[in-house]
């Protein structure tokens, strides 16, 4: 069995992707994500579809890339909404439940793309990103954010 070194004790920085970041050596091994980060991400950033962030190590190597966008959880049917509210009420403060139940949509932040460089996968970097996003938006004060949504690939 291959021994893996977890990166939990190594310093990372998370920064907004800049025009100076060279993505050409970055590959995660998923064709769809690699194509997006090499061919489409700059256009999506330019037109404010997403904001893109990089995770770098001390040597300034890009270890992961991810995108964030505002989102909302909206339901097509009252039954789906009621199921969602019922499941969510156990994590909502009692003083807010009545207001929560009346909402027609629930503000969220979306992780639209998350790619970890192929040679450092399964070492906790994706978990680091998720914890960063959760921690950031638990304290976020600029706009409402009650949930985090994730666009996932089935691979």
Regions found by a protein language model. Give the residues of each.
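Conserved N-terminal entry element of GNAT/NAT acetyltransferase domains
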Residues: 1-29
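A short, internal acetyl-CoA/4′-phosphopantetheine-binding micro-motif in the GNAT/acyltransferase core
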Residues: 112-122
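Conserved acetyl-CoA-binding loop-helix of GNAT-fold acetyltransferases
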Residues: 122-135
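Short hydrophobic/aromatic beta-strand element in the GNAT-like acyltransferase core
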Residues: 50-54, 65, 108, 113, ...
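Hotspots on structured nucleic-acid-binding interfaces, especially in canonical RNA/DNA-binding domains
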Residues: 30-40
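Conserved acyl-donor/pantetheine-binding loop and adjacent beta-alpha core of acyl/acetyltransferases
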Residues: 67-113
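Conserved GNAT acetyl-CoA-binding A-motif
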Residues: 130, 137-152
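A short helix-loop-beta-strand connector motif used in the catalytic cores of GNAT acetyltransferases and
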Residues: 42-54, 61-64, 70-79
